[in-house]
């Protein structure tokens, strides 16, 4: 069953039109409460397959399923009402063929009510992007560092540091742009390359570890909120330190339970006489 809201949301076309106007603001969201908090402040929320690592403790995003993405897409739609919501196509749900990609993407849109899907890939995925867009499915592209390919690319590292990598990013970005993506995530890409493709593409670029030269920025919300003490990529800034705050709150709760000071009289139901 689709999850619909009555208020008018920002659309993929709205996001695309922001290029050259002002920076585009985006974050990931996976749950209803977080979506509700982020919705007033962002242009679009990405229900990213990063949820596999952030919420489920997986080592990579490869183990994320289509059913997982749909469930979390529904949750984010319930918690948001004004921003555009984009849901990731997970690994294995679109690479086989453009027809498989359409079936997966159509299911996401119908069952979540979201506005668009995101897929990773460069020139090799351009035909798929064009196929989806021509059939009414807006696509957010993703070039540069591609987490779904970590098993074949040798890990998480920035790209664009040699001529071969620069040529590939240029080719990939242009192909996805020409295919009709409404915006393109550029991940883990050195600043000169990010600046160059941002200046040449029709679609806005959304950077994550790709410098302020991009048309907008996205971060994993759990990263920027400081929920992980043992993991902080160079491109992440902690805008809050929630991990120690949560730890302290739980410690205080445990101490009060053990001391029988919680629940207090104000938290207890009484019989009225």
UniProtKB/Swiss-Prot annotation:
Binding site for Mg(2+): 49, 88, 120
Cofactor names: Mg(2+)
Protein's pathway: Cofactor biosynthesis; (R)-pantothenate biosynthesis; (R)-pantoate from 3-methyl-2-oxobutanoate: step 1/2
EC top class named in words: transferase
Pfam (any one): Pantoate_transf
Entry's localization field: Cytoplasm
Annotated cofactor note: Binds 1 Mg(2+) ion per subunit.
Transferase among keywords: yes
EC number: 2.1.2.11
Function: Catalyzes the reversible reaction in which hydroxymethyl group from 5,10-methylenetetrahydrofolate is transferred onto alpha-ketoisovalerate to form ketopantoate.
Subunit note: Homodecamer; pentamer of dimers.
Name of this chain's protein: 3-methyl-2-oxobutanoate hydroxymethyltransferase
Lineage: Bacteria, Pseudomonadati, Pseudomonadota, Alphaproteobacteria, Hyphomicrobiales
């Amino acid at each position: 069953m689709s999850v619909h809201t009555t208020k008018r949301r920002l659309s993929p076309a709205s996001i695309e039109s922001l290029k050259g106007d002002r920076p585009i603001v985006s974050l990931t969201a996976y749950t209803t409460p977080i979506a509700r908090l982020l919705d007033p402040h962002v242009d679009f929320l990405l229900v990213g397959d990063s949820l596999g690592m952030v919420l489920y403790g997986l080592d990579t995003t490869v183990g994320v399923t289509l059913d997982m993405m749909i469930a979390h897409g529904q949750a984010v739609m319930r918690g948001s009402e004004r921003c555009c919501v984009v849901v990731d196509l997970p690994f294995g749900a679109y690479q086989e063929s453009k027809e498989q990609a359409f079936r997966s993407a159509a299911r996401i849109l119908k069952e979540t009510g979201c506005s668009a899907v995101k897929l990773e890939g460069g020139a090799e995925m351009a035909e798929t992007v064009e196929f989806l867009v021509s059939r009414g499915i807006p696509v957010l592209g993703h070039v540069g560092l591609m987490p779904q390919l970590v098993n074949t690319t040798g890990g998480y590292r920035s790209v664009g540091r040699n001529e071969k990598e620069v040529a590939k990013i240029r080719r990939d970005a242009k192909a996805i742009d020409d295919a009709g993506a409404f915006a393109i995530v550029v991940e883990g890409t050195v600043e000169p390359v990010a600046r160059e493709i941002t200046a040449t593409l029709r679609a806005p670029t959304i950077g994550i570890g790709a410098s302020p030269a991009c048309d907008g920025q996205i971060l994993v919300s759990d990263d920027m909120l400081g929920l992980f003490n043992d993991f902080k990529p160079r491109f992440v800034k902690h805008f809050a330190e929630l991990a120690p705050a949560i730890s302290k709150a739980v410690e205080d709760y445990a101490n009060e339970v053990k001391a029988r000071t919680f629940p207090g009289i104000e938290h207890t139901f009484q019989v009225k006489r």
